[in-house]
């Protein structure tokens, strides 16, 4: 094994505790540890335990059973799949939506639909691993631009056009980067792609439900985004994923995508829960905006407490610590203080940039920030 012992990860098992936003570590013998406030999961809108999602999943269990039992093109399609695809397409202003069992599969399918060995992919340096695997599987050439730097992107596009004048260009980025909490200027990026005749794939996994008009992501209303990928495993509080695009690309995915055709369909109860989450988002369009405002208050207070300002402006608040062991020690101290956080270390992030990935949720108690600031202050001293 090439991973240094100090950086080997270990699985920890967690169980939801009695109240919303609380979790407990499960140890050997199924013993549960103390209740901790969850500042680590991607359940941004606090929907994974929402009564409406649970009721929708339970009703679908009684109707369709647990699993789909087949691929969408054989026997796995259910009415709930069709309804979710239709309502998502309407919500996002797209012609076609197709569901996938996981975000990894959706991203793999997206890249392979838009790129081949004649394509040059120009990708943000920090895109998700699933997108990089998709590029590799497509056979396309890969070039990387400086994170969220449009000047770097344009220089690279001009160079690629010079080196391969007839190649198709595909630009790949994310609307909310999971470890930095940062976002690109999507409108300007789309204008750049239009200028250089490039397709644009936008991964909205962490943005949907939180960013953009009514939580519909940063690609909403921007028709120059060729394809959107999204997930139900974060703000939607369920599981699975989807791609949204025009009708022609949607038909291409349906007919040609192995990641769509050769996999068991999304479990119907998860689709039903995602549909219930979508209804809640439509009825509460300010949830995301309120969460973003709260996250910026956290950033301001962390700066006042002597920390470097966490990057970005959404619910992912990366607190830069630097050295690996110091970050782990601080994480353990916060856990002893009743706060569950994630220490993110290389190779997930660059060397010397270990961080606590703090994640805000809609239903976090008002006093959470004060508890965090006290624990961080004590952890620094110790």
Language-model-derived ranges and their functions:
Residues 51, 55, 59, 63, ...:
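PLP-dependent enzyme catalytic core of the Aspartate aminotransferase-like
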Residues 220-252:
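Active-site PLP attachment segment
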Residues 289-296, 303-338, 353, 360-362:
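Conserved PLP-binding catalytic core of the aspartate aminotransferase-like
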Residues 43, 143, 147-202:
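Active-site phosphate-binding strand-loop segment of PLP-dependent enzymes
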Residues 2-66, 198:
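N-terminal "arm"/small-domain region of PLP-dependent enzymes with the aminotransferase-like
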Residues 110-129, 150:
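Conserved PLP-anchoring active-site segment centered on the Schiff-base-forming lysine
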Residues 265-284, 290, 294, 303:
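Structural motif of enzymes handling amino- and sulfur-group chemistry
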Residues 54-102:
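Conserved N-terminal alpha-helix of the aminotransferase class I/II PLP-enzyme fold
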């Amino acid at each position: 094994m090439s991973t240094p012992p100090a950086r080997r990860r270990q699985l920890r098992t967690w169980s939801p505790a009695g109240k919303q936003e609380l979790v407990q570590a499960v140890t050997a013998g199924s013993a549960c540890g103390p209740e901790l406030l969850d500042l680590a999961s991607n359940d941004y809108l606090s929907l994974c335990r929402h009564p409406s999602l649970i009721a929708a999943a339970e009703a679908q269990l009684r109707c369709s059973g647990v699993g789909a039992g087949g691929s969408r093109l054989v026997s796995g399609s259910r009415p709930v799949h069709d309804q979710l695809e239709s309502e998502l397409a309407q919500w996002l202003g797209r012609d076609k939506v197709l569901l996938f069992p996981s975000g990894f599969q959706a991203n793999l399918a997206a890249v392979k639909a838009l790129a081949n060995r004649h394509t040059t992919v120009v990708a943000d340096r920090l895109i998700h691993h699933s997108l990089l695997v998709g590029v590799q599987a497509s056979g396309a050439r890969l070039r990387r631009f400086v994170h969220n730097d449009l000047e770097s992107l344009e220089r690279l596009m001009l160079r690629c056009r010079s080196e391969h004048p007839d190649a198709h260009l595909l630009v790949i980025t994310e609307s909310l980067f999971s470890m930095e909490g940062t976002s690109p200027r999507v409108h300007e990026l789309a204008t750049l792609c239009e200028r250089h005749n490039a397709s644009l794939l936008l991964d909205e996994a962490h943005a949907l439900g939180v960013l953009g008009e009514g939580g519909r992501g940063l690609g909403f209303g921007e028709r120059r985004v060729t394809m959107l990928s999204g997930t139900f495993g974060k703000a939607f509080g369920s599981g699975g994923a989807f791609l949204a695009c025009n009708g022609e690309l949607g038909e291409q995915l349906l007919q040609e995508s192995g990641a769509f055709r050769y996999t068991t369909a999304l479990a119907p109860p998860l689709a039903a829960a995602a549909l219930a989450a979508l209804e809640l988002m439509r009825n509460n369009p300010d949830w995301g905006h309120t969460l973003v405002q709260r996250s910026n208050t956290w950033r301001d207070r962390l700066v006042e407490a002597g920390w470097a300002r966490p990057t970005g402006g959404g619910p992912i608040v990366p607190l830069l610590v630097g050295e690996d062991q110091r970050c782990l020690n601080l994480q353990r101290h916060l856990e002893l203080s009743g706060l569950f956080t994630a220490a993110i270390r290389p190779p997930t992030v660059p060397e010397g940039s270990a961080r606590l990935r703090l994640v805000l949720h809609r239903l976090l108690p008002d006093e959470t920030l004060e508890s965090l600031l006290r624990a961080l202050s004590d952890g620094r001293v110790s």
